[in-house]
């Protein structure tokens, strides 16, 4: 796969740079464990609480009680995690909880071993890297700052979350292209999900799908398929 023609390399996190197992067996359970104490400590601003309550009241999948009590808010967040819901409010709360966990040493993020060397290659070739994940920008930065390969944040030019839109919507990738100031054809997006790659392609980006250990099998597709960043020369 020749990737030298691209100027920007856009990375998903879960299943691409970081094992799915780390996200689902370490990060998610950690946040669930800490929801109670987080809300009991009154660490969330009133406007966020109101947004969370409103989301819950409009959520047809939830039948529990909703109020501004720590218990109710915690229970609803646990419900969202159980559904793997890409809720912006949930991601904000999780990001704050994870920040505390990383800073006090309870968390350290896991990275595929080929990631640091590939990021170095991109930087050495005068190209640029960016991140697009459903996790909040704060959570993205934490994963790369507290990785088991040290702080990798200096390799990234920009971070994008669902503030630009959902990852299965082509308009999100168009916005990213515009904000980066580079033609979409000059961006290569790495992901592990076919529907995300399809959306990027619709916006005229190129995509490569990672087939990592632990990743979910994808429907048949025509995107580039790779199992590692090893051997790729930007």
Curated annotation (Swiss-Prot):
SUPFAM superfamilies: HAD-like (SSF56784). Belongs to the HAD-like hydrolase superfamily. MasA/MtnC family. InterPro entries: Enolase-ppase_E1, HAD-like_sf, HAD_sf. Its EC number is 3.1.3.77. Residues 212-234 are annotated as: Disordered. It comes from Leptospira interrogans serogroup Icterohaemorrhagiae serovar Lai (strain 56601). Keywords: Amino-acid biosynthesis, Hydrolase, Magnesium, Metal-binding, Methionine biosynthesis. Its cofactor is Mg(2+). The lineage of its organism: Bacteria, Pseudomonadati, Spirochaetota, Spirochaetia, Leptospirales. Pfam families: Hydrolase. One of its GO terms (biological process) is L-methionine salvage from methylthioadenosine. Monomer. This is Enolase-phosphatase E1. The gene is mtnC. It catalyses: 5-methylsulfanyl-2,3-dioxopentyl phosphate + H2O = 1,2-dihydroxy-5-(methylsulfanyl)pent-1-en-3-one + phosphate.
């Amino acid at each position: 796969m020749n990737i030298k023609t691209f100027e920007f390399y856009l990375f998903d996190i879960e299943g691409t740079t970081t094992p799915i197992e780390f996200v689902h067996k370490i990060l998610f359970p950690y946040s669930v464990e800490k929801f109670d104490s987080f809300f009991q400590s009154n660490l969330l601003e009133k406007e966020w609480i109101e947004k969370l309550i409103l989301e819950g009241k409009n959520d047809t999948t939830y039948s529990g009680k909703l109020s501004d009590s720590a218990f109710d808010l915690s229970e609803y967040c646990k419900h969202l995690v159980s559904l793997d819901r890409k809720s912006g409010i949930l991601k904000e709360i999780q990001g704050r909880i994870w920040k505390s966990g990383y800073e006090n040493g309870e968390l350290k993020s896991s990275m595929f071993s080929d990631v640091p060397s590939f990021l170095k290659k991109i930087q050495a070739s005068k190209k640029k890297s960016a991140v697009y994940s459903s996790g909040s920008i704060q959570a993205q930065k934490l994963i790369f700052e507290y990785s088991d390969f040290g702080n990798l944040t200096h390799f990234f030019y920009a971070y994008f979350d669902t503030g630009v839109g959902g990852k299965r919507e082509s308009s999100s990738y168009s916005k990213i292209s515009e904000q980066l100031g580079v033609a979409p054809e000059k961006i290569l997006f790495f992901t592990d999900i076919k529907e995300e790659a399809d959306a990027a392609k619709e916006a005229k980006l190129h995509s490569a799908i990672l087939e990592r250990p632990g990743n979910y099998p994808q429907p048949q597709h025509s995107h580039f398929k790779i199992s590692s960043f090893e051997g790729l020369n930007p």
